[in-house]
Amino acid sequence: MHFARVDVDGYTDSTGSAAHNQALSKRRADAVAAYLREHGLQADAFAAAAHGPANPVASNDMQEGRARNRRVEISLHAQ
């Protein structure tokens, strides 16, 4: 299947410095975007973005929440 755009958004938990988390979330997004391309996902454009600890999906107060916040989200946009 071919997509117009694929957005790959990387996130971290709140542990560590802002600079470290920003760089880590970018590496995560870039790695997933590369994996998708290498495994045949076709798109006119790939966008990998770093969000660091912004927009947590769980509390960073507990280990389980921090684990959920260390994630990559993929959005596929049709033509």
Locations of regions flagged by a protein language model:
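Periplasmic OmpA-like peptidoglycan-binding domain that tethers envelope proteins to the cell wall
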Residues: 9-79
